[in-house]
Amino acid sequence: MFKSLTKVNKVKPIGENNENEQSSRRNEEGSHPSNQSQQTTAQEENKGEEKSLKTKSTPVTSEEPHTNIQDKLSKKNSSGDLTTNPDPQNAAEPTGTVPEQKEMDPGKEGPNSPQNKPPAAPVINEYADAQLHNLVKRMRQRTALYKKKLVEGDLSSPEASPQTAKPTAVPPVKESDDKPTEHYYRLLWFKVKKMPLTEYLKRIKLPNSIDSYTDRLYLLWLLLVTLAYNWNCCFIPLRLVFPYQTADNIHYWLIADIICDIIYLYDMLFIQPRLQFVRGGDIIVDSNELRKHYRTSTKFQLDVASIIPFDICYLFFGFNPMFRANRMLKYTSFFEFNHHLESIMDKAYIYRVIRTTGYLLFILHINACVYYWASNYEGIGTTRWVYDGEGNEYLRCYYWAVRTLITIGGLPEPQTLFEIVFQLLNFFSGVFVFSSLIGQMRDVIGAATANQNYFRACMDDTIAYMNNYSIPKLVQKRVRTWYEYTWDSQRMLDESDLLKTLPTTVQLALAIDVNFSIISKVDLFKGCDTQMIYDMLLRLKSVLYLPGDFVCKKGEIGKEMYIIKHGEVQVLGGPDGTKVLVTLKAGSVFGEISLLAAGGGNRRTANVVAHGFANLLTLDKKTLQEILVHYPDSERILMKKARVLLKQKAKTAEATPPRKDLALLFPPKEETPKLFKTLLGGTGKASLARLLKLKREQAAQKKENSEGGEEEGKENEDKQKENEDKQKENEDKGKENEDKDKGREPEEKPLDRPECTASPIAVEEEPHSVRRTVLPRGTSRQSLIISMAPSAEGGEEVLTIEVKEKAKQ
């Protein structure tokens, strides 16, 4: 409701009210001349009312009578400060002394009369405005109160609560009481703090899930489990057959068995249920899911079967190792350890050879145990075939197993049926096992040397090709050098073939680790999108250059950018192109301007030669344009940088122009002043020689004018004009003669003139300097015809000077 009321109560500014009142007073004075005395008295009354208002003004409250509020509001409306006074304490104080409209004579009409302006706002609006002022005042008081509470803190009561007493020194006393509880012990010369049991248990606490592929601690645990498994596989058959377990050493065997059982049990209860697995492409790390997955797997069944305590039968049947045969069922951990170990080794084929050799030795160990059992069954020393009981039992039986499996002759013939059947089975198993191991060994060694065999095959094919086409020996030597260096440095011929089998994300990760630090240093690519640089890393190609190979030659069109990965290159220059200007090392970049240059700016400006073996990364122009299609912001940045680099390149090229032919006989000229360049640019078709001649003639003319007077100066000017006209005619005739001699039309030469005088820079070219040196100083009857023709060699021209006699006039 207040909003609608305040919108109606619009008050005009004070200045406008004053102007209206003054105009109304003038009208009244015009109609009533006797009102001047009344006007002065009215002004005095207004001043008196203003003083009384200033002394009696008080803040408006909700308890004031309505009559007082209405009187104050009427005065405020007359002063024009109803809704613009922000001070809540002086809400009823007027800011002007303009007389109220009510005091005017109702019979008088003026600009502010009721007929000329809308009717005044009703009293209810004034009351609402006063209420709004009161509301603003209370809101400000409330804001100040809450601000004070925020600064001083929220108090529960208006009375200040007593300050809380400072904490006593009880906690330090407790800390001092706890300090003596810490225990220390000395280790040699060091004082070591004894860790509490709870802290130690926290540190050795197992994680909720274990990544079997990346966790190295899990790999160490698998090594411990594998050792326990190998102990059982080797010594259970040995203790079962050979008489090595006796009553004197039985307690040692039992201790070793208990340790192995503890390792098995701990692995089954605490390690295997925490291994992560993949289901539907997601890695499962939830503890409940991990335990459920392990309990439903075949590995859990084998682990339970391997830990069944058949050792209890020792109480009824004695210490027979046969009851521990189920410990050999935990073979899954053994193969898992082999798989993880091969995945982290640099040369896994070495471990594969060792593992295959271990398989062979273990089979021979089992065969030796079986042979001793057969000899004991037949009776030791009863026949020539069985073990005779002499020497070390295990070594003699192992020797017999080696000769049997490898099918070495010279063994005693079996005598009984049991011996014959046993020997036949032994021969068959020996041939099968031995051939399998030999084949596996061949595969391991073949896989280890597969890359080298491929390298040898490629090199042999290339040499055969070169011999077939009678390639020179020097070229063949360079080809062999490239093959040998590539193999020695990379152990492969083309590393891109290896990366093709990997996914794009893995290729990008490898490229970032190898080449990102190099390409991020290129000034041309600084400020570009990082993703664009990542895309370029995937497109880089590695190229190997031999010592003395030209990476790029001067004058050829540049289509690639080069980044030095390994080695050095030299930039050659000078008159003969053999001077080393600079040597670029690993991490340097060259040729980047050619990627973005256009209109002839992409030509190579120098020869670049590999100083030694140089491995360079290349990026061609086409590939860069394909990448920039998706990165318009980076393209704008690259284009801007390319223009700056091209300008710098043009300045350096202008600073050292090439000197050819007759220009080599004269010293290089100084740089042309800017003022002279401006003058030369505005002369149109005038040549440099003509300007110099005019300058000398003007100097001579000034000297003659100072000596001979003004008349002689005028005559000299006329003569000078005549000489210039004659010189123009002679030049035109000489050009016509030149065109006739060369069989050209006289219209071809003027077409070439605008090209020579198109810009002031053309004045600095060498042909003009040569023309200046050979022009005659005085008048002669000889004319010089100078022409330039392209040479057979790229980047060179042939200067031709012909001398002809002028015709006599």
UniProtKB/Swiss-Prot annotation:
PROSITE patterns cross-referenced by the UniProt entry: CNMP_BINDING_1, CNMP_BINDING_2, CNMP_BINDING_3
Residue numbers binding 3',5'-cyclic GMP: G591, E592, R604, T605
Residue spans, topological domain Extracellular: 243-249, 318-320, 372-393
Residue ranges, annotated region (Selectivity filter): 407-410
Subcellular location per the Swiss-Prot or TrEMBL entry: Cell membrane
Catalytic activity line of the entry: Ca(2+)(in) = Ca(2+)(out); Na(+)(in) = Na(+)(out); K(+)(in) = K(+)(out); NH4(+)(in) = NH4(+)(out)
Residues spanning the membrane: 219-242, 250-270, 300-317, 321-335, 349-371, 394-420, 421-445
Cytoplasmic-facing ranges: 1-218, 271-299, 336-348, 446-809
Region (Cyclic nucleotide-binding domain): 530-646
Cellular component terms (Gene Ontology): intracellular cyclic nucleotide activated cation channel complex; photoreceptor outer segment; plasma membrane; transmembrane transporter complex
Lipid bilayer topology: Multi-pass membrane protein
Record's keyword terms, sorted: Cell membrane, cGMP, cGMP-binding, Disease variant, Ion channel, Ion transport, Ligand-gated ion channel, Membrane, Nucleotide-binding, Sensory transduction, Stargardt disease, Transmembrane, Transmembrane helix, Transport, Vision
Domain comment as written in the entry: The cyclic nucleotide-binding domain (CNBD) comprises three helices and a beta-roll of eight beta-strands from CNGA3 and CNGB3 subunits. Upon cNMP binding transmits the conformational changes to the C-linker domain of the S6 helix to open the ion conduction pathway. The ion conduction pathway consists of S5, S6 and pore helices from CNGA3 and CNGB3 subunits. It contains a central hydrophobic gate that opens upon cNMP binding. CNGB1 displays an additional charged arginine gate below the central gate to regulate ion permeation.
Subunit structure, interactors included: Forms heterotetrameric channels composed of CNGA3 and CNGB3 subunits with 3:1 stoichiometry.
Protein name: Cyclic nucleotide-gated channel beta-3
Organism: Homo sapiens (Human)
Gene designation: CNGB3
